[in-house]
């Protein structure tokens, strides 16, 4: 089975996302960047959209003793990790773009408060 992958193409950059099936982040259906926010959960709400656990093949690999998952469950787990990778990458890009803008806005506010802005 080939592994899923994704490519982000933006105006100034391209980024490849690839699955490493040995990495634990690609071995779960519970993503780090998906689901209800901590704020919502603290308010007592339950995550009704929580994904189901991956389905295991009925027989365990007797040589290794390691659980084997169905092909569809493997794909679900890999896509969950891939989605986390993409979400984290895009969040980092957004925050990187926001920083200079926020710094500039902060400077303008400080200038106004200090009275150094010409009227």
From Swiss-Prot:
Disulfide bonds: none annotated. InterPro entries: EKC/KEOPS_Gon7. Its main location: nucleus. Keywords: Activator, Chromosome, Nucleus, Telomere, Transcription, Transcription regulation, tRNA processing. Residues 44-58 have a biased composition (Basic and acidic residues). GO terms for cellular component: chromosome, telomeric region; nucleus. Residues 25-36 have a biased composition (Polar residues). Residues 1-62, 97-119 are annotated as: Disordered. Pfam families: Gon7 (PF08738). It is found in: Nucleus; Chromosome, Telomere. It comes from the Eukaryota. Residues 108-119 have a biased composition (Acidic residues). GO terms for biological process: tRNA processing. The keyword Lipoprotein does not apply. Component of the EKC/KEOPS complex that is required for the formation of a threonylcarbamoyl group on adenosine at position 37 (t(6)A37) in tRNAs that read codons beginning with adenine. The complex is probably involved in the transfer of the threonylcarbamoyl moiety of threonylcarbamoyl-AMP (TC-AMP) to the N6 group of A37. GON7 likely plays a supporting role to the catalytic subunit KAE1 in the complex. The EKC/KEOPS complex also promotes both telomere uncapping and telomere elongation. The complex is required for efficient recruitment of transcriptional coactivators. Component of the EKC/KEOPS complex composed of at least BUD32, CGI121, GON7, KAE1 and PCC1; the whole complex dimerizes. Belongs to the GON7 family. This is EKC/KEOPS complex subunit GON7. It comes from Kluyveromyces lactis (strain ATCC 8585 / CBS 2359 / DSM 70799 / NBRC 1267 / NRRL Y-1140 / WM37). The lineage of its organism: Eukaryota, Fungi, Dikarya, Ascomycota, Saccharomycotina. The gene is GON7.
């Amino acid at each position: 089975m080939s592994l899923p992958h994704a490519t982000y193409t933006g105006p100034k950059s391209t980024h490849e996302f690839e699955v490493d099936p040995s990495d634990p982040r690609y071995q779960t259906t519970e993503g780090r960047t998906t689901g209800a926010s901590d704020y919502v959960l603290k308010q007592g709400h339950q995550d009704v959209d929580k994904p189901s656990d991956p389905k295991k093949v009925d027989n365990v690999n007797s040589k290794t003793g390691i659980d084997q998952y169905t092909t569809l469950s493997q794909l679900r787990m890999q896509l969950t990790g891939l989605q986390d990778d993409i979400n984290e990458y895009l969040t980092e890009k957004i925050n990187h773009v926001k920083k200079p803008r926020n710094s500039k806005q902060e400077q303008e506010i400080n200038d106004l408060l200090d009275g150094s802005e010409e009227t």
